[in-house]
Regions:
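ABC ATPase NBD coupling module
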Residues: 66-68, 74-94, 114
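Catalytic Walker B motif of ABC-type/P-loop ATPase nucleotide-binding domains
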Residues: 165-169
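Conserved H-loop
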Residues: 194-201
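A short, proline-enriched helix->beta-strand linker immediately N-terminal to the Walker B motif
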Residues: 159-163
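ABC-type ATPase nucleotide-binding domains, specifically the catalytic core motifs of the NBD
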Residues: 56-59, 83, 102, 106-121, ...
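Conserved ABC ATPase "signature" region
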Residues: 119-136, 187-188
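Conserved ABC ATPase signature
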Residues: 140-144, 148
């Protein structure tokens, strides 16, 4: 599919006991946001993981992995068979995964493209300031609140300059005022950088565009 943006043709997403999703086709154009809604357990998070190439990471030690048969295109290239680190997709979970042994700045530096150290540190400081976390460079994840950790994870995803951004309820742990401010900032950055965004939420106020909502239901 030789089109800009993120395009998905899913045949099925299933576990050992049942099929979660099937026969699903959708696309998100550059700079736009498509919101995914649906009941708990329908497969919203699993769909994001399948697009990002991290579906096998969702399975617990005693849980059989999910299986997905789908074709995914990103800016004209098929990424379905690529490992996650080659897909150029940013993924932020509701419960952020930060490296506990690294400081906030070190976590963010992992996502900054190569360059002079001073320049990279400046990018990190600017990102933290935009997220309302100025001065948090030397903090460790264990000292952060849930909302602060979510903001660091969002900044890390954007600093990596992804070609698509997948968000799994990343604003849920934030207070209402900050949630609205950060959501608007993230979507504005995505629009400015022409990044397609796929957002999972259960909050009506998180819906960026009522005309761009995909409701998932159980098979």
């Amino acid at each position: 599919m030789n089109q800009p943006g993120l395009w998905v043709q899913l045949d099925h997403l299933s576990g050992p006991q049942r099929t979660l999703l099937q026969h699903l086709t959708f696309g998100v154009e550059p700079g736009q946001c498509l919101t995914l809604i649906g009941p708990s357990g329908v497969g919203k998070s699993a769909l994001l993981a399948a697009i990002a190439g991290t579906l096998d990471m969702l399975a617990a030690d005693d849980t059989p992995p999910l299986h997905c048969q789908a074709q995914v295109w990103l800016n004209g290239r098929c990424i379905s068979g690529l490992p996650c680190h080659q897909r150029q997709v940013g993924l932020v979970w509701q419960h952020p995964t930060l490296f506990a042994h690294l400081t906030v700045a070190q976590n963010l530096l992992l996502a900054v493209p190569s360059g002079a150290k001073a320049q990279r540190l400046r990018q990190v400081s600017q990102a933290l300031e935009r997220a309302g976390l100025a001065g948090f460079e030397s903090r460790h994840p264990a000292t952060l609140s849930g909302g602060q950790a979510s903001r660091v994870a969002l900044m890390r995803a954007l600093l990596a300059k992804p070609e698509a951004l997948l968000l799994d309820e990343p604003f849920a742990a934030l207070d209402p005022a900050l949630r609205g401010e950060l959501r608007a900032w993230v979507l504005e950055q995505a629009k400015t950088q022409s990044i397609p965004v796929l957002l999972v939420t259960h909050l009506a106020e998180d819906i960026a565009d009522p005309q761009r909502v995909l409701e998932l239901s159980n098979v």
